[in-house]
């Protein structure tokens, strides 16, 4: 998969090399089941029309620019992880538009002419609530009306599970509340974040979570780590001793074999029942930290 990073005004260097494509549009944080349905719909259209499948997304999150929010944004799937998921879905080209003030002031018709036509879009696919252009003035209806001279438009209706819309907002709320067991029903997999290993002492690992990912609330959770082809299940928790919020303590039944500093953590559920053995190990770990 090719990844193209562009910013406004769009350079002809990129558009000159563009191939006719089907183009799903959206921010796609999480690449949840609704996003996957939309991209797979676009993929089927691309196959039928013998076109490339490109996806257009944006970075950083629009609200950081539009809302003038200076706080660094955190994501369900930061850009690097989003790109990997797009590749797994069979996307040929990922177009990442730098969402800055100049781009935010682009008119809806300017977005269509500069970006969709610029990247030779022959068929656009977007969710029913997709907005674009300055102050979000563009919507699916304007996309169909203004774009009909250049491309077809397919609208994906609201994607629901148990009569509830699947959305990134829903997932962000579940993560904020630590309700990880409910997430696979909407995401298609467990929520996963990345951490940097600070120290390892047999079954006890201290990690600092990446600032790019959403952070679980303080608590104790069942987790899963995959290293060297093996799955290791354990417990993650924070010690409320004034330490930095992104520092977490992981405990495993066996010694933790890990090469390198980066690990990916799957957050599976809140830990309610814990074995006495795990409790004892946790108590010993806490004592070590406090003594240090």
Predicted regions and their residues:
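Core alpha/beta nucleotide-donor-binding catalytic domains of modification enzymes
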Residues: 37-97, 101-114
């Amino acid at each position: 998969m090719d990844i193209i990073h562009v910013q406004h005004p769009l350079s002809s260097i990129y558009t000159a090399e563009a191939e006719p494509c089907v183009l799903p549009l959206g921010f796609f944080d999480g690449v949840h089941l609704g996003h996957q349905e939309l991209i797979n719909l676009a993929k089927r259209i691309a196959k039928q029309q013998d076109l490339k499948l490109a996806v257009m997304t944006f970075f950083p999150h629009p609200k950081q620019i539009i809302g003038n929010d200076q706080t660094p944004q955190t994501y369900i799937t930061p850009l690097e992880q989003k790109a990997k998921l797009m590749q797994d879905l069979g996307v040929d080209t990922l177009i990442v538009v730098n969402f800055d003030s100049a781009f935010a002031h682009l008119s809806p018709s300017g977005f269509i002419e500069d970006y969709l036509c610029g990247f030779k879009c022959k068929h656009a696919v977007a969710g029913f609530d997709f907005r674009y252009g300055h102050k979000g003035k563009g919507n699916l209806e304007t996309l169909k009306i203004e774009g009909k001279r250049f491309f077809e438009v397919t609208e994906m209706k609201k994607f629901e599970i148990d009569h509830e819309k699947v959305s990134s907002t829903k997932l962000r709320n579940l993560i904020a509340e630590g309700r990880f067991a409910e997430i696979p029903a909407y995401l298609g997999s467990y929520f996963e974040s990345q951490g940097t290993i600070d120290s390892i002492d047999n079954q006890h690992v201290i990690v600092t979570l990446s600032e790019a990912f959403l952070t679980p609330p303080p608590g104790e959770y069942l987790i899963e780590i995959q290293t060297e082809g093996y799955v290791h299940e354990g417990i993650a928790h924070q010690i409320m001793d004034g330490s930095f919020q992104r520092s977490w303590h992981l405990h495993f039944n066996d010694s933790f074999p890990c090469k390198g500093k980066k690990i990916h953590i799957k957050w599976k559920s809140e830990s309610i029942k814990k074995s006495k053995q795990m409790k004892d190990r946790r108590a010993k770990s806490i004592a070590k930290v406090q003594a240090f």
